[in-house]
Amino acid sequence: QRQMCIRDSTKTFAMIADFFDITIPEENKVAVANGESLSLGAHQLTFVFAPMVHWPEVMVTYDAKDKVLFSADGFGKFGALDVEEEWDCEARRYYIGIVGKYGAQVQALLKKAAALDIAIICPLHGPALKDNLAHYINLYDIWSSYRAESEGVMIAYTSVYGHTKAAAQLPVSYTHLRAHETKANL
């Protein structure tokens, strides 16, 4: 009789063996297939592979009863859970730093997720998302397809004496563009 059973992808088990000094007995491992489901009585979990949404072995899990998508690194954000703050800014920073180079893989996951009736998204990092899910999914679609969130032009410059700053601001003075200056202290 087993005391513990780990369900994961074959790739995950291979990575554990390759990178860690851990031996999981074969009788405690159950490799799941993409789309495979597990009944836990009232809850039915479906495993959906999402390779390279940050890591090669990523898998998300969907609970059909409560309509919860456990999204791994997808839809995560930086920040503390006990601080009220807008999700978008820190989620954008998280996406760019952690998941951003895997846009095609995120797009593939979004297509798979579109077939699910999702009420809650629970990422590994950040708060559970319960309201206005279309907003979060739309932002992930924009970010992962490398489209601009809003129209604009960025002129990046550094200026010790102010001359480069004056030159960089010339295009703004001759157009209908509005200037927004952000200073970075390096």
Task: Describe the residue ranges of each PLM region.
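Active-site HxH/HxHxD metal-binding segment of metal-dependent hydrolases
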Residues: 1-38
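A short acidic, often aromatic-flanked loop/helix-cap motif at beta-alpha or helix-coil junctions
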Residues: 35-40, 53-55
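Short, flexible hinge/linker loops that cap or flank conserved catalytic cores
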Residues: 39, 62, 146-149
